[in-house]
């Protein structure tokens, strides 16, 4: 078959067609061509053979290196310094009683009426109405009434009080009873095993009458409670050392007769010696009636004087006072007029360790033996 024959030509065309179809099948591969980016982009390109081709870096270009992670540095913890705690300095020893601060001032060392600031006083930190009344020579209740201060007599720093001039006269000096004294007198102490405990002194309680009468101020000396030491001012203004008899009373409103304040056995007698009992103690039962020993006016009814519990003081005339301590209940109020034999209280054990009445009679501020005035029985 020659090259120019028609049969040869058809065979050649068929062969070329088969080759073309085969080539077309090879180029239609299912794998897409690998993306090729420009060399200028600095990226690598993949070839159909799967080889990774990395283009050479451009001239003058800086090769970037992956930064290495720096090691973490733990912060240094500095020690925390605690601020220095300073202990507050108190000007006066204090103690807590029923949730209130009680200042343990030694009033025996503070001159009464020593304030020289005029007719007004500005309250300072730590002041109490008792203290202000003491240094200004007033009765604390008169001072409270003058300045419209009600119980419990709270004051504010910077508050101005009208103090005026005091007319009451305090009783100075002091007596103290220890456990040894109590043992000699046969008193059963509440806690005999405890050592002697000092009791905060209280200011003298004064009673300014304001009507020309002598002051009825008579702060009672302490004869108890056993097991404690009480430093309450107790001596009176200078008077004759001779104890008066019942018949030597003042000519103003003389006392015709004295009554026993309650029934019962005298368990402690009057002691004239220093530190002795300044009255008599009468045993009884709780709730037992206590009556006024003579006509008079109640000048004090309260419990501000430690060691006496609920205390009533009656002024009978310019010379005589009577006092009734350790009451369970008080049935009279201050400035109330009472008659001899009138029930004024019930017996109790406030301020002491057993149920009793502590009874005192005072002549011009001096403690006298009540048995020399009371009728025999």
UniProtKB/Swiss-Prot annotation:
Pfam families reported in the protein's UniProt record: LysM, Peptidase_M23
Top-rank taxon, per record: Bacteria
Sequence repeats: 203-209, 225-231, 237-243, 244-250
S-diacylglycerol cysteine lipid sites: 26
Positions of transmembrane segments: none
Region 4 X 7 AA approximate repeats, annotated ranges: 203-250
Topology of this chain in the membrane: Lipid-anchor
Subcellular location: Cell inner membrane
GO molecular function, one term: metalloendopeptidase activity
Region span, Disordered: 30-93
Ranges where the LysM domain occurs: 119-163
Lipidation positions, renumbered (N-palmitoyl cysteine): 26
Polar residues bias spans: 79-93
Keywords, alphabetical: Cell cycle, Cell division, Cell inner membrane, Cell membrane, Lipoprotein, Membrane, Palmitate, Repeat, Signal
InterPro entries: Cell_wall_metabolism_enzyme (IPR050570), Dup_hybrid_motif (IPR011055), LysM_dom (IPR018392), LysM_dom_sf (IPR036779), Peptidase_M23 (IPR016047)
Segment forming the signal sequence: 1-25
Compositionally biased tracts (Low complexity): 36-50, 62-77
Function in brief: Activator of the cell wall hydrolase AmiC. Required for septal murein cleavage and daughter cell separation during cell division.
PANTHER family cross-referenced by the UniProt entry: MUREIN HYDROLASE ACTIVATOR NLPD (PTHR21666:SF263), PEPTIDASE-RELATED (PTHR21666)
Record family assignment: Belongs to the E.coli NlpD/Haemophilus LppB family.
Protein name, UniProt field: Murein hydrolase activator NlpD
Organism: Salmonella dublin
